[in-house]
């Protein structure tokens, strides 16, 4: 599944990619290799695998913010003005360069990608949903409890300036050791201009075995597969 976000980034012209993982990286390192098969192994680009060495067995504290804190120097070293953050458990195709342009043109502080679904009662129960105003400004993020069928499922994909990203990392750690990036972004909805952009095309969230099975089954349909691969 991790091949999809990396391919999206590579196909969007992003050649500095950092992969953050929660557990020991041997198997993932072997799978990703140098990144050559993603067309990012060039003189100017690289693929880094980073993780939090502290609290490896303390899953509550070993979250994305913990990994960012421990590898902050690698983030600060990057010369790019913007960061694109994407999940490893969601399957979709997206031109991040186009999404970045939309973000810049909007003047927003943060842009979040979401997918509108009409089956949220049965699916995406481990995901978060975005509550939007009429101008697609993000009011809040809340876990999908399956109470309604129509939801804007947050695709765990963010775009923001690198400096703001670093600021949120520090703010999150000061607030709580268990805070995630999603938590601090959600807490910042009133203070920052956070906007949602709707995704079109195939979308699946692989959060358990059933969702893995369902997504594979859906891709046996030619029209469905074309929405992802064409």
What are these regions (language model features)?
Residues 1-82, 98:
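Conserved N-terminal catalytic core of the sugar/cofactor nucleotidyltransferase
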Residues 93-168:
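Conserved core of the sugar-phosphate nucleotidyltransferase
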Residues 10, 104, 189-190:
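Anion (oxyanion) recognition and catalysis
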Residues 89-91:
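Acidic metal-phosphate-binding loop of nucleotide-sugar-dependent transferases
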Residues 163, 171-230:
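Left-handed beta-helix
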